Amino acid sequence: MKVRPSVKPMCEHCKVIKRHGRVMVICPANPKHKQRQG
């Protein structure tokens, strides 16, 4: 899980979602692409 000021999809499988008021990227194909804003 990377914590970044700006989260962007890194591949076509990445999905931008919002959980508990935080913007997150989840990626089923490449778990390295997981990101959280903060």
Curated annotation (Swiss-Prot):
GO cellular component, as recorded: cytoplasm; ribonucleoprotein complex; ribosome
Gene Ontology MF annotations: structural constituent of ribosome
Protein name per the record: Large ribosomal subunit protein bL36
Disulfide bridges in this chain: none
Keyword set, alphabetical order: Ribonucleoprotein, Ribosomal protein
Species lineage: Bacteria, Bacillati, Bacillota, Bacilli, Lactobacillales
Family per similarity comment: Belongs to the bacterial ribosomal protein bL36 family.
Residues spanning the signal sequence: none
Keyword Ribosomal protein: yes
GO biological process per UniProt: translation
Highest taxon, organism lineage: Bacteria
A matching Pfam family: Ribosomal_L36
InterPro entries according to UniProt: Ribosomal_bL36, Ribosomal_bL36_sp
